[in-house]
Amino acid sequence: DKLAKEMDDLNMGYLINLSGSGFGPQSAKDLYFNQSMKNIKENQPERFGLFVNVDFESIDDVNYGETQANIIKDAVAKGAIGLKIYKSLGLRNKDSSGNRIAVDDPRLDPIWDICGKLGVPVLIHSADPFQFWLKKDNKNERWFELKEKPNRYYAESSFIPPFQEIIQEQHNIFKKHPKTTFINAHLGWMANDLE
């Protein structure tokens, strides 16, 4: 009730929890999601929505795509209204061989397909601001952030590919899955370049 009152004070009608599954092993994600959904349904379901999240750590499992699609199906049946993909996909997530999992990795296709079939959107956050790949100097508008958080500087990374490669991987899934609604978080990091 306190949160709903604060929302009223802000003239906010609806709030979506994008991290509806939380983090950790799948059993913990399932528990967190179920508790969150129960809380919403028992309180103010007309004011709150929940997105589900998927696991990339098990991508090498034989039935990975089917398993994740079933998790999404189950979550939507329970009331999830979308899928949130964190920026770690394409940046930091690795398969069991230590290889970067690309945003357009075909093992992920069942995830995008089921969201299209179920009619739920995929809010996908790919890469980071492109300035994190530029030279750290007075012409980089994020120089201070990079000074304060040097782990965000990717230009010299041997693991993280160039910004444009990650964004292209994202655009590849948009093209490959036309029946799926994708929401490109942060305008694909190009809000200041709308050409």
Regions found by a protein language model. Give the residues of each.
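Mid-domain alpha/beta scaffold segments of enzyme catalytic cores
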Residues: 1-118
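Catalytic pocket-lining loop regions of alpha/beta-barrel enzymes
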Residues: 101-195
